[in-house]
Amino acid sequence: MSNKSNRMPLIDALKAVAAMLVLLNHFSSYGPLAEAAREAFPAIFDWCFEYGRMAVQVFLVIAGFLAARGLSAQGEALAVSPLPLIWKRYLRLAVPYLAAIGLAIIAAALANQWLDDEAIPDRATFAQWLAHAFLLHNLLGFEALSAGVWYIAIDFQLFALMTLLLWAGRARLVAPALVLIVATTSLFWFNRDASWDNWAIYFFGSYGL
């Protein structure tokens, strides 16, 4: 079966719209262009600043749906070891992510030559780069090298948590029940405490939907 036949147009459309809203949110939030845009079109870009970030929830729900579809399409427990699946997910994320981080470092170094703006990160240290490479920068308290890299780390954490829950269930009904319990706990407890926002459990309510 070709990859084309596995596409879901509605999912693709939702991701495209959400991506545009997140892009507009970033455009209205960072750098001198954001200030100029908000001065020129205050109503539009104030709205993008306040509400564009909510589109991240669309990505979280879709990512959870696709993870569940791939790992447990019929609601069954995961029968194989979770570690190879988690490693495969890391590699899938890391290759384009590290390339983007490299470009971000170069772009920031060039921008620092001409602009003095707090949105431009300082020169990256080796420890900072290493933390980003292993998707630990949020947890270790390093400054992000780019505005959206927090999501890549959270996506990896969420996939790992979903995989471990489905594997730990070891039975058809127990596995989805574990996902439901953790998602409910996230919605009504962890998601209400911003101190957890660097951890997957903070977002798992949306992911588990």
Each model region followed by its residue ranges:
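Specific transmembrane alpha-helix
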Residues: 55-72, 151-167, 181-209
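Juxtamembrane transmembrane-helix termini
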Residues: 55-89, 96-117
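Short, Lys/Arg-rich, polar N-terminal cytosolic tail immediately upstream
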Residues: 1-11
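Membrane-interface helix-loop-helix regions
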Residues: 42-44, 93-154, 185-188
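Aromatic-anchored segments of alpha-helical transmembrane domains
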Residues: 20-27, 106, 180-192
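Generic alpha-helical transmembrane segments of integral inner-membrane proteins
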Residues: 20, 98-106, 110, 160, ...
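Functionally critical transmembrane alpha-helices in membrane proteins and complexes, commonly lining
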Residues: 9-73, 93-97, 134, 202, ...
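Membrane-interfacial entry segments at the cytosolic side of transmembrane helices
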Residues: 170-178
